[in-house]
Every structure is written in structure tokens, then in C-alpha cells.
Regions:
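Two-component system phosphorelay core
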Residues: 1-124
Length: 124
């Protein structure tokens, strides 16, 4: 396991901002995190498939969807990484796409682990 897989939720999510967005509704926060756990891997797989197929337009669209989801959940670093990936796909820069994918996937792995621990009650 990498250090990112042991990182706390606060390293990935601006919790004060997110709690304000949901009006401190812990039930809504739990629902949003559950949706994230369900949707994020599907979108990441779709992104991987689009990149492997050379469908950069689809990769750009999927990266854009990931960026929006992450930004709405106050996951700013992940949203920035998705934005970098979106820009690389738009530019058609294969080398940058690969670098951006590696950075995004590493961050997303740690983020999903942190959300999982949070959901399991493993941290506040």
C-alpha cells in the first residue's frame, strides 16, 4: 500500500467547505460519498478505455465529468488533476495524457480509500 492509501479524508476533501455545502447534513454527506464510491470507478474505467482506444474526445468528456464531480464534493486536488487530464486530451498530447492519467489514478486510489475509511467510521 502507498502512503496515499493511508491518508485521511482531510488530505483529499475540504471538509469544512463540503459540510457547509450540505448544511452539515451528515446523512446527505453519506449519500454523496456513497454515490462517489459507486460512480468514480466507473468513470475512471471509462476514461481508461477511451484513452486506450485513442478516443480523445471521449476521454476529454469523461475527464470533464470527473472534474465536475470532484469539484462539487470539494475534492479540489482531484478536480485539478482531472482538469489537467481534460486539457491534455483536448490538446491531443499523448505523453501528457499518460502523465496526467498516472497522477490522477494514484490520487483517486488514495481518495477512494480515504472515503471508504470515512464511510466505515474509521475516522472523523
Amino acid at each position: 500500500m502507498t502512503n496515499s492509501e493511508h491518508a485521511s479524508i482531510e488530505q483529499y476533501v475540504n471538509m469544512p467547505e463540503l459540510l457547509a455545502r450540505v448544511d452539515n447534513d451528515s446523512e446527505l454527506l453519506t449519500e454523496l460519498f456513497a454515490l462517489f464510491q459507486e460512480d468514480s470507478p466507473k468513470l475512471r474505467d471509462a476514461l481508461d478505455n477511451a484513452v486506450r482506444a485513442g478516443d480523445l474526445r471521449q476521454a476529454e468528456k469523461t475527464a470533464h465529468a470527473l472534474k465536475g464531480m470532484l469539484a462539487n464534493l470539494s475534492m479540489k486536488h482531484g478536480a485539478t488533476l482531472a482538469a489537467n487530464l481534460e486539457a491534455a486530451a483536448r490538446a491531443g498530447d499523448e505523453g501528457e495524457i499518460q502523465r496526467a492519467m498516472a497522477a490522477f489514478n494514484a490520487d483517486e486510489t488514495g481518495l477512494l480509500a480515504a472515503v471508504g475509511r470515512f464511510m466505515a467510521g474509521g475516522e472523523p
